C-alpha cells in the first residue's frame, strides 16, 4: 500500500468529514479509497472498458397485469446465462418487487436490464453494475 499526501480546501474537507461520520468509516483513508474505487468504476463504465460485470436489477411491477409475470419469467429463463438468481417480494395486493442478480458481459447485462425495465407495467427499474 502506498502513502500519499493531498491538499484539499476546507469546505471539501468538512464535507468529507461529515460523510465519514455519517457512513461510519474508521478513518479518512478508507473513505478516500472507496471514493477512488467508485470514481474509477464509473469512468470504466463511461468509457466502455468494463468487459464483465455483476449487476443487480431491481424493479417493481403490477402482478395482475395480463401475462406479465409469465413474460418476465420467460425472459429470465431465455437468458439463463445472464440471470443467475432472483428474489421475489409481494409488496401489496397488486405490486411485486423483483431483485435479480445478473452476471456477464456488461453490454449484455445492460441490454437485458433495459429489456425488462421497458416492459409495460414494470416500474421503478434500477440497475447497479459492479466490476468483475
Swiss-Prot record:
Transmembrane segments: none
Cofactor(s) named in the record: Ni(2+)
Cofactor note: Binds 1 nickel ion per subunit.
UniProt-listed Gene3D superfamilies: ACT-like. Chain A, domain 2, Met repressor-like
Residues that, per the record, bind Ni(2+): 77, 88, 90, 96
GO biological process assignments: response to nickel cation
InterPro entries: Acetolactate_synth/TF_NikR_C, ACT-like_dom_sf, Arc_rbn_hlx_hlx, CopG, CopG/NikR_regulator, Ni_resp_reg_NikR, Nickel_NikR_proteobac, Ribbon_hlx_hlx
UniProt key word Lipoprotein: no
NCBIfam families cross-referenced by the UniProt entry: nikR, PRK02967.1, PRK04460.1
Function as written in the Swiss-Prot or TrEMBL entry: Transcriptional repressor of the nikABCDE operon. Is active in the presence of excessive concentrations of intracellular nickel.
Protein name: Nickel-responsive regulator
Amino acid at each position: 500500500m502506498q502513502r500519499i499526501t493531498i491538499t484539499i480546501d476546507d469546505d471539501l474537507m468538512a464535507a468529507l468529514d461529515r460523510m465519514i461520520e455519517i457512513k461510519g468509516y474508521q478513518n479518512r483513508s478508507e473513505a478516500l479509497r472507496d471514493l477512488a474505487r467508485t470514481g474509477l468504476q464509473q469512468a470504466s463504465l463511461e468509457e466502455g472498458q468494463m468487459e464483465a460485470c455483476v449487476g443487480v436489477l431491481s424493479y417493481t411491477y403490477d402482478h395482475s397485469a395480463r401475462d406479465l409475470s409469465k413474460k418476465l419469467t420467460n425472459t429470465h429463463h431465455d437468458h439463463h446465462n445472464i440471470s443467475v438468481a432472483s428474489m421475489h417480494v409481494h409488496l401489496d395486493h397488486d405490486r411485486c418487487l423483483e431483485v435479480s442478480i445478473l452476471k456477464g458481459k456488461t453490454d449484455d447485462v445492460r441490454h437485458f436490464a433495459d429489456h425488462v425495465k421497458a416492459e409495460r407495467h414494470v416500474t421503478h427499474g434500477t440497475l447497479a453494475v459492479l466490476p468483475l
